[in-house]
Amino acid sequence: SSHYDIGNDFYKMWLDETMSYSCGYFKHPEDTLYQAQVQKVERILEKLYLKEGMTLCDIGCGWGYLLIEAAKKYGIKGVGITLSKEQKKKFEERIKENHLEDQLEVRLMDYRDLPESGFKFDRVVSVGMLEHVGRDNYELFMKSVKSIMNPGGLFLLHYISALQEHPGDAWVKKYIFPGGVVPSLREIINIAGD
């Protein structure tokens, strides 16, 4: 969480208004970062086939934009989990600003604690968080997701992938993305296939 607890002001300097810290969906070359992030979230929410009253968990929810949009547009109830105290604080402010206290909550929680949480959800989403999990924990991550899914539930996983497995750059792993791994599609399909 230290990477995300640098302070929200630092991230505000270079992220767009959504405070989304993951890949955007640029439909057109002239799209702004803000448009790309909004378009990405809209596309993810469409793929989740949300209906009013459904429950949604966002693993690695960041500053909460995805859940806020899901609550406003689809009338879902949601829980976001993050390891960052700074993200949690800002997300709680955004929940209040949008008057969504009856629909959304954010927990300071590790995905590994989900099986014991008692939570159950119709939909689960994780955007740009799998890269932090590490190869040795992919299977545990998938089991944790499965443990909170209602029967017939849907899980959408968005991550950066590589064509093949590789250890990554030592300098980047030390100074930019400690513990981070870019998984291959094959790795994730093999684990998620169940």
Protein language model features and the residues they cover:
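A short acidic, Gly/Pro-enriched loop at the edge of an enzyme's catalytic core
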Residues: R112-V124
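Conserved class I S-adenosyl-L-methionine
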Residues: E52-G60
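Substrate-binding/catalytic lobe of Class I Rossmann-like enzymes that use SAM or dcSAM, i.e.
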Residues: S161-D194
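Conserved SAM-binding strand-loop segment of SAM-dependent methyltransferases
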Residues: N98-R112
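N-terminal auxiliary segments of SAM/dcSAM-dependent transferases
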Residues: S1-M13
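Conserved beta-strand signature within the Rossmann-like core of class I S-adenosyl-L-methionine
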Residues: G152-I160
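Conserved SAM-binding loop of SAM-dependent methyltransferases across substrates and taxa
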Residues: W63-Y74
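A short glycine-rich, Lys/Arg-flanked "PGG" loop and its adjoining helix->strand segment in the class I
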Residues: E139-G152
